[in-house]
């Protein structure tokens, strides 16, 4: 739900209508990432009349958050893969680059596969199983590689491109180190990432079903979230504290 902010997916709004028809049925809303503002939206739009919220800390003490500003992302990526052993996920923005980077890694002797929404389901399942089993070390993927991914020994997650918002970044980076052992979350940033994300926000197809006024509200919200994501790439403060503060958690 938090990925859609104020409007959510239109189908989610039907839940409130169903709740009116079935007032005695308990309802539990779950999300991995939600700012305090989005929590209030969920309560309001899904007709939770009593404030009854349980939150776990966003802090993952075993994760090291790193931002590298570079115009040589591929060189940096090869360096980190050769420096650190273990399973990895590399998130990239588009499907074409998943294949290109995979081929490059294979040429360097690093076992890798690519994954995106355009592949047949059977192919996606096979590649995920090969990666889960350790037969393949690195999965190069778009954000389609997300739901249900729970491999405990991922030693690092690399974002080859800056995501459009902190919610996406936190969820994807959080696939590292689920076994509690040290892991690294590395974001490679170049100024073109910000320009590309602005273009995607302004020309995105996911909001085409919305009316003009709502579409403008959603676009302005997405610009603000992109601004917060860009600040993360430039901040001099502790990145862990930045993440915790973004999600409304107090830090010392």
What do the predicted segments below correspond to?
Residues 1-213, 224, 249-251:
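Helicase motor core with emphasis on the C-terminal RecA-like subdomain
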Residues 206-252:
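C-terminal accessory/connector segments of nucleic-acid motor ATPases
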């Amino acid at each position: 739900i938090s990925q859609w902010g104020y409007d959510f997916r239109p189908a989610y709004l039907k839940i409130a209508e169903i709740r009116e028809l079935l007032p005695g049925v308990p309802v539990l809303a779950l999300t991995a990432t939600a700012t305090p503002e989005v929590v209030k939206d969920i309560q309001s739009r899904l007709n939770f009349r009593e404030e009854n919220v349980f939150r776990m800390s966003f802090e993952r003490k075993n994760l090291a958050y790193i931002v590298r500003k570079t115009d040589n992302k591929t060189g940096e990526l090869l360096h980190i893969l050769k420096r650190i052993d273990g399973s990895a996920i590399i998130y990239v923005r588009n499907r074409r680059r998943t294949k290109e980077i995979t081929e490059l890694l294979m040429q360097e002797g690093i076992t890798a596969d690519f994954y995106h929404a355009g592949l047949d389901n059977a192919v996606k399942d096979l590649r995920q199983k090969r990666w889960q089993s350790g037969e393949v070390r690195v999965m190069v993927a778009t954000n389609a590689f997300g739901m249900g991914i729970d491999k405990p020994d991922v030693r690092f997650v690399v974002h080859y491109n800056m995501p459009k918002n902190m919610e996406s970044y936190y969820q994807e980076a959080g696939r590292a180190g689920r076994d509690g052992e040290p892991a690294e979350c590395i974001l490679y940033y170049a100024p073109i990432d910000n320009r590309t994300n602005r273009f995607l926000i302004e020309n995105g197809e996911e909001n085409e079903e919305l009316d003009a006024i709502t579409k403008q509200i959603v676009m302005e919200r997405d610009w603000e979230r992109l601004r917060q994501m860009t600040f993360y790439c430039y901040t001099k403060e502790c990145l862990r504290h930045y993440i915790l503060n973004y999600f409304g958690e107090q830090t010392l």
